[in-house]
Curated annotation (Swiss-Prot):
Residues 1-20 are annotated as: Disordered. One of its GO terms (molecular function) is protein homodimerization activity. One of its GO terms (cellular component) is cytosol. Homodimer. Disulfide bonds: none annotated. Coiled coil: none annotated. This is Protein GrpE. One of its GO terms (biological process) is protein folding. It is found in: Cytoplasm. It comes from the Bacteria. Pfam families: GrpE (PF01025). The gene is grpE.
Length: 186
């Protein structure tokens, strides 16, 4: 009987050790699954925040640039009024009332465009900026810095800082050096 008790004592501690190892392995496996689930949950929360942020940005851009097509269409009207004023004689008494009406209409258009963050680009004398201006021609000029805008054919416009229409310009270039004449060479 003592032998049986001793055998039982020897077997009993080993069984809990095997079960403990199984439980430890199971706990470790569950902890890994929990960590993976927590990581996945964090990623999903981050993805949701990114989607929400992108949606808010899209709505903001839609509000900001909803007027783009409409404002672009109005620019032709502004251009026509400006050309009409340029072509008319300010000293002609017969058209003075019509000219004043055109000036007031143009001022109202300009004020309205400014109210909706449509900004005119009139770059005469400024350095050429290919992101905002379109060069229609190059002209030699001794008085202007090479690469600067000499003349504006058509003003450009920005809507909330974004290019709506580039300014059509003439850009200056350095005068060509004249070759020495035959008399100078001799």
């Amino acid at each position: 009987m003592a032998d049986e008790q001793q055998t039982l004592d020897q077997q009993t501690p080993e069984q809990p050790t095997g079960a403990a190892e199984d439980l430890t392995a199971r706990v470790q496996e569950l902890e890994e699954q929990l960590a993976a689930a927590q990581d996945q949950a964090l990623r999903m929360v981050a993805d949701l925040q990114n989607v929400r942020r992108r949606a808010e940005q899209d709505v903001e851009k839609a509000h900001k640039f909803a007027l783009e097509k409409f404002a672009g269409d109005l620019l032709a009207v502004v251009d026509t009024l400006e050309r009409g004023l340029e072509m008319s004689d300010p000293n002609d008494e017969a058209i003075k009332p019509m000219r004043e009406g055109m000036e007031l209409t143009l001022k109202m258009f300009d004020d309205t465009l400014r109210r909706y963050q449509v900004e005119a680009l009139n770059p005469e004398g400024e350095p050429f900026n290919p992101e905002q201006y379109q060069a229609m021609a190059m002209q030699e000029s001794a008085s202007a810095e090479p690469g600067s805008v000499l003349k504006v054919f058509q003003k450009g416009y920005l809507l909330n800082g974004r290019l709506l229409r580039p300014a059509m310009v003439v850009v200056s270039k350095a005068p060509a050096e004249t070759p020495p004449s035959i008399d100078e060479q001799a």
